[in-house]
A protein has these predicted regions:
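Residue-level signal for inorganic ion chemistry
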Residues: 30, 66, 88, 110, ...
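Hydrophobic face of alpha-helices
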Residues: 48, 67-74, 85, 103, ...
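Terminal low-complexity tails and localization/encapsulation signals of metabolic enzymes
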Residues: 1-35, 68, 72, 122-145
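ALDH superfamily catalytic-core signature
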Residues: 230-333
Length: 333
């Protein structure tokens, strides 16, 4: 399944320099989906040089042309939603209907940023000197390292890649080793949509090794990460040494609050969706429920009744509401 991909560098799919691979597991069957390419230090350096060169091309591309390409990515995602969704279900384990919804959300993000490309406004400020005008012009920050998690690889890769492209930046995307194929398919769509060589790159392999080498480089000017607080702290410390800008979305500890004036049927439906989407492997999945005493019993009964009706199974099977946990580690926890 992964033989058509590999590392995406300078507009081309290529196998890793050392020809190393790692196994990707289907969580529903525990079977090996295939072996994905594992990047070495040589591959990371190639990607950095590629992105540095791609930046010069993309930042000098007009906002209108960038917008056209980004919108084309959204269009192709919708055309190929079944392919992308299948990758998500096979690698993450989520039900196919959830996977299709995630692809739609990712396409919407690209469409939104296609319009934002043309809305990067500067400013004119009043000067203290009578014959002076002060103008503010916004320029691309540079090459972006996008570190993508496994639980929502399409929507979160879309968020990171599309915003970088809208701002005129090139990007090196690192998918999680659990879900490389879904992001590879998305990057291939970027290629087919006309993104110039070197503007979008992908490195697949050991997360710590790739991330550390990217952040050690003077070429990387910004890091975007969605992940755990523990990893976020490590990234923040490394980024500080290079004064790299950082955008972080870390962990979650979400309460679900129910007041006494609610429509209980709607609230119970929302609670089930929030708690069990992607089998609860979501940073905003509720782990605490605060219910006003007057409605507590009613809520508990409604929630339990709906939970009993959820169908557990392989995400590829029609009618499945709850797929497997994605990794053995999560099952053991």
């Amino acid at each position: 399944m992964y033989s058509n991909f590999g590392q995406f560098i300078n507009g081309q799919w290529q196998q890793a320099e050392k020809k190393e691979t790692y196994k990707v597991i289907n969580p529903a069957t525990e079977e090996v989906l295939g072996e994905a390419s594992k990047a070495s230090s040589v591959d990371v350096q190639k990607a950095l040089k590629s992105a540095e060169k791609g930046l010069e091309t993309w930042k000098n591309t007009t906002p209108w042309q960038r917008s056209y390409v980004i919108r084309k990515i959204a269009d192709l995602m919708r055309e190929r939603k079944d392919v992308l969704a299948k990758w998500l279900t096979l690698e993450v384990g989520k039900p196919l209907k959830e996977a299709i919804g995630e692809v739609g959300g990712g396409a919407d993000i690209f469409e939104w940023n296609a319009e934002e490309t043309k809305r990067i406004y500067g400013e004119t400020l009043q000067s203290r000197f009578p014959e002076t005008r002060v103008h503010v012009y916004y320029q691309p920050v540079g090459v972006v390292a996008a570190l993508v998690p496994w639980n929502f690889p399409i929507v979160l890769a879309s968020r990171k890649i599309s915003t970088a492209l809208a701002a005129g930046c090139s990007v090196i995307c690192k998918p999680d080793v659990i879900t490389p194929g879904a992001v590879m398919e998305l990057v291939n769509i970027c290629k087919d949509a006309g993104v110039p060589d070197g503007v979008v790159n992908l490195l697949s392999g050991d997360p710590a090794e790739i991330s550390n080498e990217l952040l050690d480089s003077d070429i990387i000017k910004k890091v975007s990460i969605t992940g755990s607080t523990r990893v976020g702290k490590l990234i923040l410390k490394k980024a500080a040494d290079k004064v790299q800008r950082v955008t972080m979305e870390l962990s979650g500890h979400s309460p679900f609050i129910v007041f006494d004036d609610v429509d209980m049927n709607k609230v119970a439906d929302m609670a089930i969706t929030a708690k069990f989407r992607n089998n609860g492997q979501v940073c905003i999945s509720p782990n605490r429920f605060y219910i006003q005493e007057t409605r507590k019993e009613e809520f508990v009964n409604a929630f339990v009744d709906r939970a009993k009706k959820l169908k557990i199974g392989n995400g590829m099977d029609e009618g499945t509401d709850l797929g497997p946990l994605t990794t053995a580690k999560r099952l053991e926890e």
